[in-house]
């Protein structure tokens, strides 16, 4: 029996979560809610994607919903999450992907409509955060609202976990060179909280803040207070890259670290989550890659055996959305056996 899922917010992540879910027989998306997109437009936006290409299957708007490859998905247009009839639609697990309801209390509104569990596809200030392959052991079935953390945390955490488990991280700094996202501006415009963030996205490298490195301390408590970082927003439409520079306790050559990362990428715990490449790749080579993090063996460097720079790629849309689906499957299995 497939896990019944609803998606609130049919933006970049909502639509790509649906693309990933359609490939997974363990999951069935039964409903989508978005107050700003009518059904015809939802079908168009799902079918055509400037970054990930045209959807290969059949998409049509019919009977107040979407029919994708013969499967009917109800479409709602409620602004208030508590009014979305998830229960009537049969959706037990709801992906909260509006980017608005990221707090535990706000996301809990979905439970009033009949949802049993809410997965926030963004970092949360107070909901428990989970990174697949890193801290799923901490999940408890009585948790009703959880977060899949951020795309950058999903890239950084597996990398940091492998390094810390083998060598011990003393401290580190992270920079993510991050593609454009929907919150940025096409031309200079007002952005009162972040003045630099109001500048033209397509023509600037924009320094920005990110909580991704600090969030790793929440999913790997041993690293709490040992990592922080920043972001550089760059004019590419998709795919980002983490630069993690760390001091390690147990000295190792860069060659040894590469071997450790390769072995980890093939391990049962991280296969499909942590990737490994030793080829001369660039960012567009990773569009559509479903790994959370792809270690670039040729791009990193070591100053000495205790001070290294590690580079890891991620499709901040597709890879992250794949993990949202994986998280749903993982928690549903734990819920079923509780």
Swiss-Prot record:
Record bears the keyword Disulfide bond: no
Gene Ontology cellular-component terms listed: cytosol
Pathway(s) this gene product operates in, as recorded in its UniProt entry: Carbohydrate degradation; glycolysis; pyruvate from D-glyceraldehyde 3-phosphate: step 1/5
Gene Ontology BP terms: glucose metabolic process; glycolytic process
Subcellular location: Cytoplasm
Binding site for NAD(+): 12-13, 34, 79, 316
Molecular function GO terms recorded: glyceraldehyde-3-phosphate dehydrogenase (NAD+) (phosphorylating) activity; NAD binding; NADP binding
Active site, per annotation: 151
Catalytic class of the enzyme: oxidoreductase
Positions bearing the site annotation: Activates thiol group during catalysis: 178
Protein EC: 1.2.1.12
Positions annotated to bind D-glyceraldehyde 3-phosphate: 150-152, 181, 210-211, 233
Keywords: Cytoplasm, Glycolysis, NAD, Oxidoreductase
NCBIfam families: GAPDH-I
Quaternary structure, from the entry: Homotetramer.
Similarity comment: family membership: Belongs to the glyceraldehyde-3-phosphate dehydrogenase family.
Name of the protein: Glyceraldehyde-3-phosphate dehydrogenase
């Amino acid at each position: 029996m497939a896990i019944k899922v609803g998606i609130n917010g049919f933006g970049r992540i909502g639509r790509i979560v649906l693309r990933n879910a359609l490939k997974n027989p363990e999951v069935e998306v039964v409903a989508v809610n978005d107050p700003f997109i009518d059904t015809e437009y939802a079908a168009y936006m799902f079918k055509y994607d400037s970054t990930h290409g045209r959807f290969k299957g059949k998409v049509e708007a019919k009977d107040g919903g979407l029919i994708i490859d013969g499967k009917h998905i109800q479409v709602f247009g409620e602004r208030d999450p508590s009014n979305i009839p998830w229960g009537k639609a049969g959706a037990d697990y709801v992906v909260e992907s509006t980017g608005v309801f990221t707090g535990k209390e706000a996301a809990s509104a979905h439970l009033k409509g009949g949802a049993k569990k809410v997965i926030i596809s963004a970092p949360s200030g107070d909901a428990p955060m989970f990174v697949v392959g890193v801290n799923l052991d901490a999940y408890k079935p009585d948790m009703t609202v959880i977060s899949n953390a951020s795309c950058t945390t999903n890239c950084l955490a597996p990398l940091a976990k492998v390094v810390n488990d083998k060598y011990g991280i003393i401290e580190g700094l992270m920079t993510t060179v991050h593609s454009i996202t929907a919150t940025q501006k096409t031309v200079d415009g007002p952005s009162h909280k972040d003045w630099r963030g109001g500048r033209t996205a397509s023509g600037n490298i924009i320094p920005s803040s990110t909580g991704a490195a600090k969030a790793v301390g929440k999913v790997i408590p041993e690293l709490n207070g040992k990592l922080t970082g920043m972001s550089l927003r760059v004019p590419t439409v998709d795919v980002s890259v983490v630069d993690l520079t760390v001091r390690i306790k147990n000295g190792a050559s860069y060659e040894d670290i590469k071997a450790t990362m390769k072995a980890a990428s093939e391990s049962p715990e991280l296969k499909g989550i942590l990737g490994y490449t030793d080829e001369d790749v660039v960012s567009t080579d990773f569009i559509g890659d479903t790994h959370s993090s792809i270690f670039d063996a040729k791009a990193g460097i070591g100053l000495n055996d205790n001070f290294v720079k590690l580079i890891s790629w991620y499709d901040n849309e597709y890879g992250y959305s794949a993990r949202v689906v994986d998280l749903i499957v993982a928690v549903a299995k734990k819920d079923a056996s509780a």
